[in-house]
Curated annotation (Swiss-Prot):
GO terms for cellular component: plasma membrane. InterPro entries: LpxK, P-loop_NTPase. Pathway: Glycolipid biosynthesis; lipid IV(A) biosynthesis; lipid IV(A) from (3R)-3-hydroxytetradecanoyl-[acyl-carrier-protein] and UDP-N-acetyl-alpha-D-glucosamine: step 6/6. This is Tetraacyldisaccharide 4'-kinase. It holds the Pfam family LpxK. The gene is lpxK. It catalyses: a lipid A disaccharide + ATP = a lipid IVA + ADP + H(+). Its EC number is 2.7.1.130. It comes from Nitrobacter hamburgensis (strain DSM 10229 / NCIMB 13809 / X14). One of its GO terms (molecular function) is ATP binding. HAMAP family: LpxK. One of its GO terms (biological process) is lipid A biosynthetic process. Keywords: ATP-binding, Kinase, Lipid A biosynthesis, Lipid biosynthesis, Lipid metabolism, Nucleotide-binding, Transferase.
Amino acid sequence: MHEPAFWHRPSSLLSRLLMPVGALYGAVAARRLMRTGMRAGVPVICVGNYHVGGAGKTPTVIALAGILRSLGETPVVLSRGYGGRLHGPVHVDPHRHTAADVGDEPLMMAWTIPVIVSRQRAAGIAPARALGASVILMDDGFQNPALAKDISLIVIDRARGLGNGQVFPAGPLRAPLPPQLARTDALVIVGFGPAADDVAASIGARGGLVLPARLIPDDASVVALRGRRVYAFAGIGDPQRFFRSLRACGIDVAAERAFPDHHPFSQRDVADLQTAAERDGLTLVTTEKDLARLRNSEDLAAFAQAVVAFAVTLAFDDEAVLRSFLTDRIGRARR
């Protein structure tokens, strides 16, 4: 879905009109947060958002998996598989499954990390442990009470923040902010800007850990696009962040097109992009997540060959602090 513009305005008539609905939605969500979930038998680290849409969860999960491996752990990702048709539980095989089967994010992560997709998260525990999981990395699901979480990390974009701070549909929040803050162990603030400062201060005041991080473009991606004029397109939670990242690397973005998050590209979409790029002599560029969806469609795979993926990795400003935190909290979870 495309986020409505009024979600990111301090005050609007439409937001005020929707506040009663948001209050009902928020009351239900807040009660769900109070429930105690099933214990997995191994430590569970949840990577989530306070709001709908994306804010860098997938690169955060990938970065955490690398750190956990360096600590001697065997992480397995547990995902709901948003956008996929399979309910699971299923062990994602990137050579066999498609984005239509398991969702684009699990498919992309499965190239480097074992991923279990399970619509019912609790049902994914046994297959994750069968893969040797010493730690389960839960991709999203912070507001889902099915599983008990030993560590909850929330990701926020520092340029975007939490919009108008209202609960869906009056704003982007999935639940009222206070009960979400109370269940947050660490806050990952990504990028640059002041929009997440108030939340970071609240987490710090509660004794939570605040972890600044940044998305680092892959050198090969930058080199591949240097000196070219590009047509950038993306169907992610915040396409504008992707476009800003390209420009920040000195890439000449001559045209851009934003699609809804997890957008299922059609032949018409592809034809429009290709026609415009060829007409103006532009190189097509998109995110790794979007390219994963394109490559895994038989009808669109040929088009995908002509598209450059702009790859990024997430790096924490102080990884040593995070490593110490994970070691301590995982150790506590095992006692």
